Amino acid sequence: MSRAFYLNLAVDNLKKNARTIIPYILTSVLTTMMLYMVVSLANNPNLNEMLGAMTLTQMLGFGVVIIEIFAFIFLFYTYSFLIKRRQKEFALFSILGMEKKHLARVLFYETAITLFVSLALGIGLGILFDKAMFLIIAKMIGANIILGFYFSFIGMRQCILVIGLIYVLIYFYSMIRIHISSPIELLHSDHMGEKEPKAKWFLSIIGILCLGIGYYLSVTTKNPLTAFYFFFVAVVLVIIGTYLLFTSISVTFLKLMKKNKNYYYKTNHFISVSGMMYRMKQNAVGLANICILSTMVLVMLSTTLSMWSSIDRVVDSQYPRSVMGNGYGDASNIDFDEMSEELIRMGIVPKNLIAYKRLDYAGYLKNGTLITDYSNEGMNAVNEIQEFYCLPLKDIQDYENMKSSLKPNEIYVYSNAETIKEKTLSLFGKEYVVKKQLDHLKMDESNPNVTEHYYIIVNSEKTLEKMQEDQANVYGDNASAIRAYYSFDCDANEREVIKKLGQNENINDFIWTSKSDQKQGLIELYAGILFIGIFLSFLFIMATILIMYYKQITEGYEDKDRFEIMQKVGLEQQDVKKAIHSQVLTVFFMPLLVAGLHVCFAYPMIEKLLHLLFVSDSWLYIRTTMFCFVAFALVYIVIYVLTSKVYYGIVKRNA
């Protein structure tokens, strides 16, 4: 047989299977397009020249890796559905005399055509929309728009290599499936596995434990740094638990309902319970995938939108003044009054001045004693680690409106954690009397509250220096130094002020930065996270659409047979339709409900992770999450309604 014969046969096969092949090709095209755009943006020289694009470029590079992994998993998963639906077709070819090597050639041309269309359209659309994405990013980070056309050879090469490799592996996978199966097995493969599912108690218990432990970690973890460590553990546990929930726990629960004879042997209950058992067995993995993808969309959109919405609030709280300077080592010995006089001589008039010296260190309090060596304490100690900020009273007296005084052995204490019960604190071997525990500290409003922390207010700078010496005796070379902080507002241009300060020999040991620069850096970071979050959310929604579409096709062909069987045993067509359609609704909306449950339990941990990125407005995150869930639920319903038309078309045609 000639090459043209195999090519024509491959084209005919693609046309005959257009209902399932076209959505797959469309998904492959969109995945290729998105991969090209992200790679192109990450390597775009015009983007790299923009102010504040370094972090954004790094975020895009991270997005490239995620998209490549997703493309491999998702294209492989959806192709497994296609190859399963075509088993009978391959069996007929074999019965008609076509050998497996001939089938291999036909599949080769089918795969090659699909790959060519995916690359050609995907890269073409990527080039078309690449500039639009570039302009959106430039607008997000407030950069100047650079006009002109840019083609990414790296993006095209990456798409050809990655998508090409995926299709090569898909081709070999299909060859293995055909090689190990006989024509008879292929012919009847779509009718296999119709035995009643068994209750899997062991896997059900494992699933419940995985979900329970994952939820427990999220709810009970208090320290944001610990939350970051446990987040990935909790995610893995919940993913495992989700798969077991749909594959084992649901079937086990339905089995228990079946054992209740008073409940089970009623017409409505009998049909719904028995039907749901088979549906859960056949659709479990797909439903779990939809649930996990839905959860990922909700989490990504809610967190990234919360971060982007809080930029101004974060900047104002973290950087309360226009210009900020930090001095370490010898620079920390500077006299603040002399510094203010120097600034005035330079023509810079500092307003709303905040200036203090501070000693920072970490540890945790145990019965009023600072524990500094926790290397042998394990994860429990990590959970307890607290930050300590020690300041002299005179530096913050005016800012905090404190009128009282302290003796050398007395301290004021403020904590965002818990009330100190002890009357004295032992810090680096020296006892300090807690004169008062403060209820509020103004300067803590600009602290990101990443961990539990204490402000220790001592009577003088001399006492602070003595505490630093005591700390050095404990930590040695790892001891922290006293830091001088000097910040102010001014009428002049911030960047010009920073430039002048850096050129002054008397104060050039300070590291100066401006509020506008810090805001630009934050915009750069959050813009990258938001862009990748929206990009990946679109990918996951696209995957959800395709899975639901294929599930509707599967349900349609299976329910066609169920309609016939139930009508033959005497059930009215209206009752059969009502029972089956209610089962379909339950099956397809269960992932959305479980995803909502996952998001609710994920809230405590995600809230703490947002603290690491300085987002501490919990109510903003709650509102954003609720909005995202409602919006996604509406999209989910629209997807279901649109894909269900395929289902009803199959059932009505065959009922």
Where is each model-derived feature located?
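Hydrophobic alpha-helical transmembrane segments of multi-pass inner-membrane transport and secretion
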Residues: 19-46, 55-91, 111-125, 205-206, ...
